[in-house]
């Protein structure tokens, strides 16, 4: 299968640690899980967020910074995370390439869909950075867009601190119940916080299945007993 995995930036740091942006034990666990999926014969691409480094809305709230500028700064944070993952993966023997929607030829490739597909066919992990290269789009939307462009069979959204989709935030609402399977239409109707709503709508429109799992269960994401499934219809 061809899989695209969406990782949040926060998943790269360790909760309760020293407050650093990256934690090697976490990076090692992610690398091991990616390797496990790859060893099963799957082609894998990643989209990484930048929330561990920067969130644009926080800057616009504190300073007179326009939203597009803040969004571009957030895109740069995703590039930094992508480079960290690339180099770390390669120290573990996992061939990896970074493709950026904003041209940065000194440090990574520019996003060219056919080239990215070729890397995946050769067994390399592909990391897509800098979002879609335009403001007002989240990395959730980027993940759906790249999954569709790459012809992915499934988008795996790896969540930090939860094991799937719930009717509410299980950390704040003890009555929140786990959802094993649901359609994209129901997610939108019930305003469930699975992902950005525009991302869910895009996946629904184009028939893309989304699997939501905990970040520590990436290697088992294809097992039916793991996580939650958002079906197009």
Where do the model's predicted regions map?
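C-terminal catalytic "cap/lid" subdomain
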Residues: 1-233
